[in-house]
Structures are given as structure tokens and as C-alpha cells.
């Protein structure tokens, strides 16, 4: 069982961004937390981060994973290309946001990508990733 975790633009700057919104975790801390979860749950996890839409598309198009957790970052609000790629990906998938996008600026409240995911977790900090991973693990176990 392999789960791909995709982090979009500016998520590499965690720990340097507004800590009131994004917390104190660095991207490296987040990757370690996800990898630790994978080891404890006997799930292969790969964390991929890019600030470039095309690189994210290319990674999704490889289709070499059984489940997907994605934080599209700002692409959430306008990337129809990522939305279409997510629609192509026929695996359990969850959109995650560290902050509660529904309590932020108006332009951040709309997600064009969530409607092609199984669900969206927003506002639970980095722990939203763990909840998404748990869901995907359970969903994949049900399918086998």
C-alpha cells in the first residue's frame, strides 16, 4: 500500500510563514511526522512538494500510488489543471489544509479541487494529514 502526499506552493516555507495561521511545524517536521506514521502503520508514504503546477501534474500523472493526500496550497482556489488531474486519479484521495480556509479571506474559501476528492480536512493544523492518512488506509483495507 502506497500513499502519495502532495504539498503545493509555499508549503516548503512552513515554520517561516505566519505561525498564528500555519503553526510552528517546518516542512521537514511535517515530512518526518508523515514518515513516522507510515512506519508505524506499515504504509509506504512518499511526500512530494513543489511550487510549480506542472511538476505537481507530472507527479500525479505517474499513477503509481494507491491513495493520495493533497494540499494544493494556493492552487486550491484556481487550478483547473490540478482539478482535472485529480479527477483522472481513481484512488481514495483527501484534500488537506492546515488552516481553516473557510474562516480566511474570501478568495481562499473556494476550492475547485475538493469536489473531485473523497473529502476535505481544513483547519486542524498538520494533524489533518494524519486524519487523511487514517481514512485512506481504512478505505484501501475495505477495498482489498
From Swiss-Prot:
Q: Which domain of life is it from?
A: Bacteria
Q: Indicate the residues that form the catalytic site.
A: 22 (proton acceptor), 97 (proton donor)
Q: In which residues is substrate bound? A: 71, 77, 84, 98-99, 108
Alphabetically, the GO molecular function entries are: 3-dehydroquinate dehydratase activity
Marked site, Transition state stabilizer, at: 17
| Pathway(s) of this molecule | Metabolic intermediate biosynthesis; chorismate biosynthesis; chorismate from D-erythrose 4-phosphate and phosphoenolpyruvate: step 3/7
Q: What is its EC number?
A: 4.2.1.10
UniProt KW keywords: Amino-acid biosynthesis, Aromatic amino acid biosynthesis, Lyase
Q: Please give the biological process terms from Gene Ontology that the record holds.
A: amino acid biosynthetic process; aromatic amino acid family biosynthetic process; chorismate biosynthetic process; quinate catabolic process
Q: Which Pfam families does this one have?
A: DHquinase_II (PF01220)
Catalytic reactions on record:
3-dehydroquinate = 3-dehydroshikimate + H2O
* HAMAP family (alphabetical): AroQ (MF_00169)
Q: What is this protein called?
A: 3-dehydroquinate dehydratase
Q: Which organism is it from?
A: Thermotoga petrophila (strain ATCC BAA-488 / DSM 13995 / JCM 10881 / RKU-1)
